[in-house]
Amino acid sequence: MSYVIAFYIHHHGSGHFMRSLAIATALKHDKMVFLGSDLNRYKDIVPENIQVLDLPMDTPLSTDNKFTEGSQVDCFHYAPLQVKGVTERAAMITNLFLENSPMLLIVDVSVEVAMLARLAAVPTVVIRQHGKRNDLPHKLAYQSAELLIAPFDKELETSEDVEVLRKTFYSGGFSRYSKNQIQINPFNDQIAILIGKGGSSITLEVIIYIAQQCPDQYFHVLGEIKIAQKEHPLNITFHGQTNNVEEILSRCALVIGNLGHNTVMEVATINRSFIGIPENRPFDEQLDKAQAIAHINGFEMVLPENIFKTDWKRLVQNLLVIVPSMDSLITPHAIGDIATEVKRLAERLF
């Protein structure tokens, strides 16, 4: 039977989109849909065979003058009242379900969308993330799903929920890069600083502080950051948003960045030593991931509150003499295995 595979993509950062794109590419399915807010920013890289449903944001606008949080609802993370965007989203999503049946929905990520799909009789695959997700909304979303996918190895599991563990397929790690493409030997005096799109405590002040402590190192800053007009050390280059991130990273022996999933996996793919700064995220996601990979050679964590208390010169020097094993987080066939699991589920369902 013909069926549609749809991906709900959370708008925060770019990691959810990049993961969905990788899985969709591996699926090679003829009928696929991406749905989420602010997807138009990716219009130049979405394949032509994938339909895009750009949803309104679910936050109140100035015109939502009757907006209220309403009574507390334990089964959802976010369920405001009288927000037009929320009403429109629900209508657009359920209309998509109605017009594209049968459908399998891959949710990356939203408890509310997963539950809406189940209420509409649409089977789901829910992508798991690190973090303390033993709350009721997560438990209900996981129960409602036909399959849970963890884009990391089972050895990195931090949950103790037996039902969640039993339902989870562990793909191992992957990124948009390929191990086979990395042929450049790194230079010990080159360090990359990654600034993600989800918000970071790695500010210009922090970058200057680190560079001043490490005058023998040259720093490549990748990502959007507000650069003041004041002078900064000469051992810093601000590349901004660039298309040759992989090439720059591969020249660097060490990477400094936050602990978003995709950042960790990209560093792991090129197998560079990594100083991870866990940002304050819901459910302690990045801190949980840092603790999960703490045993990996070449990884060190610096808490945001300790940035200006850290001896960066010593930390960098210590890491540069270690042979990293960050690549142990990567499973070369991970994306293909996810595609196989999704297809197997769809064949059983439809």
Locate the predicted segments by residue:
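A short, glycine/small-residue-rich beta-strand->loop->alpha-helix junction that serves as a flexible
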Residues: 9-21, 200-202
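Conserved nucleotide-sugar phosphate-binding/catalytic loop shared by glycosyltransferases and other
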Residues: 10-11, 30-84
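Short amphipathic alpha-helix
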Residues: 16-27, 40-41
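Donor-nucleotide binding loops and adjacent catalytic segments primarily
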Residues: 24, 186-254, 305-306
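Conserved nucleotide-sugar donor-binding subdomain of glycosyltransferases
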Residues: 71-113
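A donor-sugar binding/catalytic signature common to diverse glycosyltransferases
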Residues: 107-108, 245-288
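A nucleotide-sugar donor-handling region in carbohydrate enzymes
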Residues: 144-200, 224
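C-terminal amphipathic helix plus adjacent low-complexity
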Residues: 314, 318-350
